Curated annotation (Swiss-Prot):
Protein name as annotated: Recombination protein RecR
GO biological process: DNA recombination; DNA repair
The Toprim domain, residue ranges: 83-178
Summary of the function given for this chain in its UniProt record: May play a role in DNA repair. It seems to be involved in an RecBC-independent recombinational process of DNA repair. It may act with RecF and RecO.
Family in the record: Belongs to the RecR family.
Cross-referenced PANTHER family: RECOMBINATION PROTEIN RECR
HAMAP family from the UniProt entry: RecR
Keywords of this entry: DNA damage, DNA recombination, DNA repair, Metal-binding, Zinc, Zinc-finger
Zinc finger (C4-type): 60-75
Annotated organism of origin: Brucella melitensis biotype 2 (strain ATCC 23457)
Amino acid sequence: MSKRIAGPEIERLIQLLARVPGLGPRSARRAALHLIKKKEALLVPLGGAMQEAAEKVRICSCCGNVDTSDPCTICTDERRDPATLIVVEDVSDLWALERADTMNVRYHVLGGRLSPLDGIGPDDLNIKGLVERVASGAIKEVILAVNATVEGQTTAHYITDQLSNFDMRVTRLAHGVPVGGELDYLDEGTLAAALRARTTL
């Protein structure tokens, strides 16, 4: 058992920070120390912002985005093209595409990708909601912006099959997305090129 080096509140802060993706125990300790040193300028406001987010964050019942309102800001933005829908695996992919600032459209978040080995099937994803949105008749193009992994390809083919009876185009991202790559790690220029070069399936 390792020695404790600080009080339980600080230890808990370090443990929670270590659970954030990209932060291991060492990075969490450094982050905790930085926050503590900047208590008034950073720790207190961060604590308040996290408390407020915990109370107000919602999952959009329409698209699956994370926001403080339901429907979310993107779904209620009347300046966005309601006839084009970009399908992504996760909210982080949606945010990455928004950073590319190439298309002013709406989104649909699946909440993952098909992965039989991990026990993730169609019923575990928000595919039914996607089919219902397309069935409304307002959508003329669905852009599949899933990751270029084996699971992503499987998900894209399954969705294409599910949407095959509707009178609309199904396209997917093309050039710029490397095989095995994940959208959240791509730069804005690459994402913009991929959106412009999408192809019909």
